[in-house]
Amino acid sequence: MANNKSSKKRVQIAERNRLENKSYKSAMRTLMKRCFSACSNYSQQPGETAKANVKASIDSAFSKIDKAVKRGVLHRNTAAHQKSRLSAAVKQAIEPAPST
């Protein structure tokens, strides 16, 4: 337990930052899920509107991930991993692997 004024304040600040980071990560995960669902929708029913939806969702997810790194919520290697997952899903949805 905190014994002096500065350590009590640090506990409060850490809790505040934890909650902010938690909500930011949650928003980021939501955008990633939207991107994955847009990819699956496009795979099932290809079309120009579905393709535009995929592009918009990946752009917003990438933006949120990059901002999370900038704010210190996420490590840059973790962000690169997440962006790679999204890119692979979009690539597979838009350009499916040819059957050989």
Swiss-Prot record:
The keyword rRNA-binding applies. One of its GO terms (biological process) is translation. Keywords: Ribonucleoprotein, Ribosomal protein, RNA-binding, rRNA-binding. InterPro entries: Ribosomal_bS20 (IPR002583), Ribosomal_bS20_sf (IPR036510). Residues 79-100 are annotated as: Disordered. GO terms for cellular component: cytosol; small ribosomal subunit. One of its GO terms (molecular function) is structural constituent of ribosome. Binds directly to 16S ribosomal RNA. Belongs to the bacterial ribosomal protein bS20 family. This is Small ribosomal subunit protein bS20. It comes from Prochlorococcus marinus (strain MIT 9303).
